[in-house]
Structure formats: C-alpha cells, structure tokens
C-alpha cells in the first residue's frame, strides 16, 4: 500500500511539473530572454521531473522484485525517463538547445499521460514476470530498444521541424503575387547557401546591395543546418542503440524460442525501423540528397517507430503480446 501510494504521488508530481514546464517554455519562446529566471526554472523543473520518474521506477522495481519492463505501462514510464535522461546529458554538457526542450517536454507529457490514462489502468498493478521474460537479457534488450526509440524520436522530430520550415518557405514564395519576387527570393537563398561559411562576419555587415530577405534566408539556412546536424548526431546514436537492441533480442529469442528470428510482427516492424534509419544515414552521407531528402526519410521513421512500439502492443498480436493492452 505504501509503495502504491508513493508511486501514485511521484507520477502526479512529475506529470504536473512537465505540464508547467511546457507553459514556461512557450513563454520563453514568445518573450525570448526577457524573463531571465524562466530558463533556470525550466532546468530545475526538469531535474525534479527526472528524480520523480527515477523514484517511480525504483519504487516499482523494489515492490515487484524485477525490472519495470514487464508491460506497456512500465515501458512507457521508462521511455519518459529516457527522455529526461536525454535532457540531463545536454545539461551536463552545458548546451542550450531550445529546440530539444521543445521536443523533450511534450514527449514526456505524452508518454506519461498515455501511461497513466484509463486505457492502461489494469497494467498499473505489478505482476509476476511470465517465463519468457525471466531472463538476464531483459534489461539489455528492452533498455537498448527504449533508448534507441527515444533518441530516434528526438532526431526524427528535428527532421520534421526542417520539413515544416522548408515547406513554409516554399508556400511563402509560391504565394508571392509577382514572379520577380519569387525568383529574387530563390536566387538570394541559393546564393547564400553556397557561400563560404568562413565569410560569415563579412556577410553580417549590411551592404546596400543586400535586401532584408537575404538576411532572413541566411539565418533560416543556418537554423536548418543546425537542426540537420543535431538530428544526424541524434539519429546516429539511436541507430547504434537500436542495432544493439535487435541483436540482443535475437540472441534472447534463440534462448527462449529456439530461433533467432521468427518474423513476429514486433520483430518485423523493428527490422523495418532499422532499415528506414539505415536508409536515412546512407542518404545523409550523400551531399546531393542531404537536408530535405534525408529529413523526409527520418519523418517516415518517426511514424514507423510508433507503429512498432505502440501499435503492435495495442493490437496484442504475436509472440510479444504479453504485457500488451489486449492481453490483460
């Protein structure tokens, strides 16, 4: 009873704090750095969230006697914890990435909100592990897969942001009433795109022959380039986690079911996810196809991850149906 009450308190504290953090972040985005204290409040709030979710997982671990990876509810809580870990790593490196803040806080809110919703009420009660899950591979496989999903989701959302910015600019240019302005904007963007980045200081010095739209295009391109760079790094890390998770899962499957691969729905979609992001990394290495093309592939990967992680669990089909929505 004590553990259940403590778990309930920690869940609601973390959920409430994250909800407040989203409001703080929106105010920061709208007002910039005019309110200095908000940035510190955001960091403190994320630290509180991290420790609350950590306490929640530890409490459930002690109460159940096994790692909290046995069902969809526990994996969602662990997923929200890995999102908070992602933020803590950035804090330790003292990097201020507002676009990561924009991604991480809603992700924690969504995962915790769904985990604590009425749909998964029956999973809140910790149960004894089924024989297939009573293995030392449980921690290795599940933790690597969840870490992979977390980093890949963050990287994919950065790619989605690139597509949104790009298509907004495209729609804006198409909406120009005069063809002259359309070509002017396009040529200005193309000219700045291929300029030597070492001449950045010279470019920032306003000259009579450069229009204001040129400065807007330059900063937009710089922002897209930064998003793409961080997205590539994040997805590369997530791809490593996903690869290790798939390999450890195959070894575990051989021990449990006598076969490394059974083309189970979960396994199939995990393989599709791996293929999608392998294609992304291949395209990203090609200078002619980077940015827009690689971002489209990564955005597809975002949807594929949710089908693999959440969709299959909700349907409750295949060998991975234990701990799913329909199996209860």
From Swiss-Prot:
Asked whether the UniProt record includes Disulfide bond among its keywords, one would answer no
Superkingdom to which the source organism belongs: Eukaryota
Provide the alphabetized UniProt keywords.
Chloroplast, Cytochrome c-type biogenesis, Membrane, Plastid, Thylakoid, Transmembrane, Transmembrane helix
Q: Where are the transmembrane segments?
A: 12-32, 45-65, 72-92, 100-120, 145-165, 234-254, 263-283, 296-316
Q: Name one GO biological process term.
A: cytochrome complex assembly
Q: How does it sit in the membrane?
A: Multi-pass membrane protein
Location relative to the cell: Plastid, Chloroplast thylakoid membrane
Record bears the keyword Phosphoprotein: no
Q: How does it assemble?
A: May interact with Ccs1.
Role summary:
Required during biogenesis of c-type cytochromes (cytochrome c6 and cytochrome f) at the step of heme attachment.
Which family, according to the similarity comment? Belongs to the CcmF/CycK/Ccl1/NrfE/CcsA family.
Q: What is the protein name stated in its UniProt record?
A: Cytochrome c biogenesis protein CcsA
The species this protein was found in: Phaseolus vulgaris
